């Protein structure tokens, strides 16, 4: 089974949230990358402040580790309100959400992570709260039960999810602002690593930061995690300064190659090439070949490989690309390109 503590996993682990909080930007002016999102949010937040209104409810989605929680914190700071944080799986009962909402003050931001995992009962409570700033709750049981309405102060709900497709239409339609976070460029990640190093008091050369950024899979959380591990290596094996050579040696020791792939990524690609002739192969067969769950392949391993052009999904199954063969120095079959063309819909 997959190692839950993969160093290139975009999900937070252990004390990581606390460590990331120390280097997290607090205002849009400090926010690096995502230029379209930053520009739009500057306008939306500025307009809401001019009108002295709460910002429209905002849905933020994208792969893990790209800064959804960071954006929620920035929204709260820019709007001058407090941030109340929870997550979908924690809100089991309607009363859990009601308790949170009745403590909100005007201008506060309620951040619900993994909002796609809300129970239907809790989701129903959200609808009038989002639309009319009213809370409908039931008091009592059986024939004596009665419904009461509580007025809520104007607030902003920020929902975050890695799987926007699992949101119900009624919930999704109630968000006035929807933002998708994309993978970061190496240039933006280099700036993020440099900023984190300065805030953490880590001595680092520009080339060292760029080497870390190149292998961070377009994800700030991974970049900051790699920075901490390379810092450890530099202090023990070097003079404490992160150079390109130190970063390269440290990341090679951590089994993170120049594309940011770890042993699990390489294992999947090699199985596809060596056991299935490059594909096409069904995801269930591929999962069995590497002893992994289908969901792990689809949600954890595949997205970055597809985004980098090493794997494609076709109606007939998964296929390795020319990039995958080149990565391992394996000669691709001559029919590879035509086979991929034939597997694409409408071709």
Swiss-Prot record:
The keyword Cytoplasm applies. SUPFAM superfamilies: P-loop containing nucleoside triphosphate hydrolases (SSF52540), Winged helix' DNA-binding domain (SSF46785). ATP binds at residues 24, 65, 68-70, 131-133, 174, 184, 221. CDD domains: AAA. It is found in: Cytoplasm. Residues 4-184 are annotated as: Large ATPase domain (RuvB-L). The RuvA-RuvB-RuvC complex processes Holliday junction (HJ) DNA during genetic recombination and DNA repair, while the RuvA-RuvB complex plays an important role in the rescue of blocked DNA replication forks via replication fork reversal (RFR). RuvA specifically binds to HJ cruciform DNA, conferring on it an open structure. The RuvB hexamer acts as an ATP-dependent pump, pulling dsDNA into and through the RuvAB complex. RuvB forms 2 homohexamers on either side of HJ DNA bound by 1 or 2 RuvA tetramers; 4 subunits per hexamer contact DNA at a time. NCBIfam families: PRK00080.1, ruvB. This is Holliday junction branch migration complex subunit RuvB. It comes from Teredinibacter turnerae (strain ATCC 39867 / T7901).
């Amino acid at each position: 089974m997959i190692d839950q503590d993969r160093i290139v996993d975009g999900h937070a682990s252990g004390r990581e949230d606390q460590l990331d909080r120390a280097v997290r930007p607090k205002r849009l002016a400090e926010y690096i990358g995502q230029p379209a999102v930053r520009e739009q949010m500057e306008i939306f937040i500025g307009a809401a402040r001019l009108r002295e209104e709460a910002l429209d409810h905002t849905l933020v989605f994208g792969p893990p580790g790209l800064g959804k929680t960071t954006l929620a914190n920035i929204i709260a700071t820019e709007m001058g309100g407090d941030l109340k944080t929870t997550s979908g799986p924690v809100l089991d009962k309607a009363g859990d959400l009601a308790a949170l909402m009745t403590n909100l003050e005007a201008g506060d931001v309620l951040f619900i992570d993994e909002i796609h995992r809300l129970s239907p009962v809790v989701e129903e409570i959200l609808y009038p709260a989002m639309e009319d700033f009213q809370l409908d709750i039931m008091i009592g049981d059986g024939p004596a039960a009665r419904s009461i309405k509580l007025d809520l102060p104007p607030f902003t709900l920020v929902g975050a999810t890695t799987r926007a497709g699992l949101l119900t239409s009624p919930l999704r339609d109630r968000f006035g602002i929807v933002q998708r976070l994309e993978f970061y460029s190496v240039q933006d990640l280099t700036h993020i690593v440099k900023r984190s190093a300065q805030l953490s008091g880590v001595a680092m050369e520009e080339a060292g930061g760029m080497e870390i950024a190149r292998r961070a899979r377009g994800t700030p959380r991974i970049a900051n995690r790699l920075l901490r591990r390379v810092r450890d290596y530099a202090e023990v094996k070097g003079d404490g300064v992160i150079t390109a050579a130190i970063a390269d040696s440290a990341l090679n020791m951590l089994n993170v190659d120049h594309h940011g792939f770890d042993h699990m990524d390489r294992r999947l690609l090699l199985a596809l090439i060596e056991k299935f002739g490059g594909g096409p192969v069904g995801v269930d067969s591929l999962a069995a070949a590497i002893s992994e769950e289908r969901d792990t392949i689809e949600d954890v391993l595949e997205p970055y490989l597809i985004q980098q052009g090493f794997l494609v999904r076709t109606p007939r199954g998964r296929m390795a690309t020319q990039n995958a063969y080149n990565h391992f120095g394996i000669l691709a079959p001559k029919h590879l390109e035509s086979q991929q063309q034939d597997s694409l819909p409408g071709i």
